[in-house]
């Protein structure tokens, strides 16, 4: 529901992931250079993109004439954050399915075809209903049918490509007045340790997201 801190938590993500490797820095720099990003400078910080929910499918995954990369490519090796997920256009959300599966996006127009990198961590936030509350909240103003239509904007096929879905409750006054939780620096320390353990198990540069069932 509104005020639960889900958007704030997502926007803290840029301070948590491990830095880009040397090869990843070059990948991100090439994308930024190809897009003519103003004021871009090479850095080890991972990209964080948060497009508005009115973005078109072409703006999200790429397209247009001439062909241009979309937000998913600009977020390559970083985070693509979709706030108010169920407010996005259905065709834009559905266009994410193949890139999330393959880590790249194929763009075609007339005789031109380009395959662009799109290996991202997708993070999204959504309310349980159009009014922001959902049927379990006595203050919910939405009809059951309206809530059903709202949630149907996230298809089962796209939901299957989201590894983790977490319900976030609105914090109580008591919890807000209690001891503070972990800060971003502490979380980052745990993430870096977990990444090293994962590299020892899978090999340098490989993550659980890229591991196969075999």
Where are these regions (language model features)?
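Walker A/P-loop
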Residues: 1-40, 102
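Long C-terminal interaction/binding lobes of large macromolecular proteins
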Residues: 16, 63, 69, 81, ...
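Conserved alpha-helical scaffold flanking the Walker A/P-loop in AAA+ ATPase domains
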Residues: 41-80, 112-113
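Basic, amphipathic alpha-helical bundle interface domains used for macromolecular binding and assembly
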Residues: 67, 90-214
């Amino acid at each position: 529901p509104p005020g639960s801190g889900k958007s704030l938590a997502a926007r803290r993500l840029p301070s948590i992931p491990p830095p880009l490797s040397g090869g990843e820095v070059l990948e991100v720099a090439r994308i930024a250079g190809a897009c003519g990003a103003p004021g871009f400078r090479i850095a080890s910080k991972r990209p964080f993109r948060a497009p508005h929910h009115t973005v078109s499918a072409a703006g999200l995954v790429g397209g247009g004439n001439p062909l241009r990369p979309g937000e998913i490519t600009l977020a390559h090796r970083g985070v693509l954050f979709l706030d108010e997920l169920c407010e996005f256009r259905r065709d834009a959300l559905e266009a994410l399915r193949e890139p999330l599966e393959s880590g790249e996006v194929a763009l075609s127009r007339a005789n031109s075809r380009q395959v662009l990198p799109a290996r991202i961590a997708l993070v999204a936030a959504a309310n349980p209903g159009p009014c922001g509350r959902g049927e379990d909240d006595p203050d919910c103003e939405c009809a059951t049918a309206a809530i059903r239509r709202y949630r149907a904007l996230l298809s089962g096929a796209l939901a299957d490509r989201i590894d983790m879905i977490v319900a976030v409750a609105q914090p109580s006054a008591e919890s807000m007045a209690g001891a503070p939780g972990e800060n971003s620096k502490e979380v980052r320390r745990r993430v870096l340790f977990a990444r090293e353990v994962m590299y020892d198990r899978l090999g340098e540069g490989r993550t659980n997201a890229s591991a196969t069932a075999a």
